[in-house]
Amino acid sequence: MSTNEVGKALGTGVVIEAVESMTGAESIAPDHMGRGARPSTQYVPDVAHASHALQREVENFLYRQAALLDAKRWQDWTGLFADDGVYWVPVAPEQTDWLGEPSIFAEDRLLMEVRMGRLTHPNAWSQAAAWGTNHLVGNVVIEAVDGDTVRTYSRFQVMELRRDTVRHFGGSYRHTLRRGADGSFRIALQRVDLMNGQAAYDYVIQAWL
């Protein structure tokens, strides 16, 4: 009689116990949830009740910011930040503060100016090769409105072409926008959570995403 036939006749449990007693092996129930699985840290945004006009204003601001990066208009892009504005790319999504934590980027206006100087320096040979980016921004959500401050969430995809090499970056933006005296928004905080932030790269990320 085959093992399958024995299993049908005696029941699978009996056969397993018999095999265990003969071999000394111990069966382990399958873990369908994944033995090493961790709970998801994917951020889920809140949704505030905002006017259609404010929604469109926020969307257009984010689209323009992305367009300035693609055009390499660094001065105009950094000009979107408040004097105390911060650009932050954390290493891990569970990080809550850019101070005292390892980060991919953690730059105030002064450090942005330093990076811009490196990107535009005539002897920056890493920038001599033809390269460019293309941003796609969507799923824009207004999370909260508090006076002149608006918190937003959005998703992005970036394609970077450098010579013959294409790299893709994806993730989410979280902006804290503050309306200035002239009525326009300035960025108090831009948080960039990279989906592939811990991936291995042949060379470092040199410009803002």
Role assignments for model-derived ranges:
Residues 65, 77, 112, 152, ...:
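Hydrophobic pocket/interface hotspot
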Residues 59-60, 133-135, 170:
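Short solvent-exposed loop/turn micro-motifs enriched in small/polar/acidic residues
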Residues 206-209:
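Short hydrophobic/aromatic patches at helix-to-coil boundaries
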Residues 2-6, 10-75, 79-83:
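Short, low-complexity N-terminal intrinsically disordered segments enriched in polar/charged residues
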Residues 2-6, 11-14, 32, 147-153, ...:
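Short beta-strand edge/turn micro-motifs at domain boundaries
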Residues 83-153:
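A solvent-exposed, acidic/Ser-Thr-rich amphipathic alpha-helical stretch
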Residues 100, 164-166:
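Short, solvent-exposed loop/turn segments at secondary-structure boundaries
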Residues 160:
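Catalytic core of tubulin tyrosine ligase-like
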